[in-house]
From Swiss-Prot:
One of its GO terms (cellular component) is extracellular region. It is found in: Secreted. Residues 1-16 form the signal peptide. Keywords: Blood coagulation cascade inhibiting toxin, Disulfide bond, Hemostasis impairing toxin, Myotoxin, Secreted, Signal, Toxin. Pfam families: Phospholip_A2_1. GO terms for biological process: arachidonate secretion; lipid catabolic process; negative regulation of T cell proliferation; phospholipid metabolic process. Snake venom phospholipase A2 homolog that lacks catalytic activity. It shows myotoxic and weak anticoagulant activities and induces local edema a few hours after injection (5-10 ug) in the hind paw. A model of myotoxic mechanism has been proposed: an apo Lys49-PLA2 is activated by the entrance of a hydrophobic molecule (e.g. fatty acid) at the hydrophobic channel of the protein leading to a reorientation of a monomer. CDD domains: PLA2c. Transmembrane segments: none annotated. This is Basic phospholipase A2 homolog Ts-K49c.
Length: 138
């Protein structure tokens, strides 16, 4: 459980329902979220959006954009619940805000799984100093 908390802090600062996000990533990829994605590329972890290094890094870029588009939500404080049913993430909220947050987190976890072939261990701990700003809009 401690590893999931550390992962969440690294992956998104303190945004979102961090325990659930960590569980989703592990369930979809089988990877330890903290050590595999916590500081990956230019977009995973704290900081703004930068030019993605690869498809895995783009998952984090899109996730940050997803959070940015949330309405009437506080991704830092709000929490949500979800279920793992037949190897699929099911967001279980009726309230729009937690459901939207859950859908953002579900999308990044699935994106990581779909792009496991682009995952590069050399980008696991990337110094953000060498990341370029992007003109790409969310």
């Amino acid at each position: 459980m401690r590893t999931l908390w550390i992962m969440a802090v690294l992956l998104l600062g303190v945004e979102g329902s961090v325990i659930e996000l960590g569980k989703m990533i592990f369930q979809e990829t089988g990877k330890n979220p903290a050590t595999s994605y916590g500081l990956y590329g230019c977009n995973c972890g704290p900081g703004g959006r930068r030019k993605p290094k690869d498809a895995t890094d783009r998952c984090c870029y899109v996730h940050k954009c997803c959070y940015k588009k949330l309405t009437d939500c506080d991704p830092i404080k709000d929490r949500y619940s979800y279920s793992w049913v037949n190897k699929a993430i099911v967001c279980g909220e009726d309230n729009p805000c937690p459901k939207e947050m859950c859908e953002c987190d579900k999308a990044v976890a699935i994106c990581f799984r779909e792009n496991l072939d682009t995952y590069d261990k050399k980008k696991k701990i990337n110094l953000k100093l060498f990341c370029k700003k992007t003109s790409e809009q969310c």
